[in-house]
Regions:
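Non-catalytic alpha-helical scaffolds and adjoining flexible linkers that form interface surfaces
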Residues: 1-185
Length: 185
């Protein structure tokens, strides 16, 4: 045994986050399928979850770590959330931070559109799009004061996007994401 993650069950949040990684891995990687960098990404995210220290205050860091891990694994698995380009026009999506009039529309089977679409089931603002785009980076989006960017309601909105994207693209739902939603709602 090279690594053991026996402590992942220390709380329900960590367990659900680790289970989400496992469930998505089963869906994305076949038995003989060799995904470049997939295992190292899984291990890096499991390490992060394993090393997580729970705080006494309401903490959404585990939720954000789980969401980011799934975004990374979806990208490596070839079904990345297409958050950088409009699915209707192909134009880059560059959220104008501070412009509260600007919005983007999420379509679970296509991606994000800068053009309003009747099939869209979610409207997101510029700061939410920018946060979602930052989740592709290795580190969590942390403010200069050390706090996580975005309130809980935004992270739950991003969780909804991940849930519906996985469901639309892989035609399966992850039970662990329902668990995370229940824990943080």
């Amino acid at each position: 045994i090279l690594k053991s993650y026996s402590g992942l069950g220390k709380n329900i949040e960590c367990l659900a986050a680790a289970q989400a990684i496992t469930e998505l891995t089963f869906l994305l990687v076949g038995n003989n399928d060799k995904q470049q960098n997939y295992l190292s990404c899984v291990l890096a995210h499991l390490d992060r979850i394993y090393l997580y220290e729970e705080s006494k205050e309401e903490d959404i860091k585990m939720l954000s770590m789980s969401i980011q891990s799934l975004i990374h694994l979806l990208a490596i698995g070839g079904i990345n959330l297409p958050i950088h380009h409009c699915c209707k026009t192909g134009e880059p999506i560059i959220p104008p931070l501070g412009n509260w009039e600007w919005s983007c529309y999420y379509l679970p089977s296509e991606g994000f559109s800068s053009i309003e679409d009747p099939q869209s089931n979610l409207k997101i603002n510029a700061s939410e799009v920018a946060l979602l785009q930052r989740l592709l980076f290795p580190e969590l989006p942390i403010k200069s004061n050390g706090e996580l960017l975005g309130p809980k309601k935004v992270w739950l909105k991003i969780l909804f996007i991940i849930e519906t994207w996985i469901s639309a693209q892989l035609e399966k739902e992850l039970s662990s994401l329902k668990m995370l939603r229940e824990i943080y709602s």
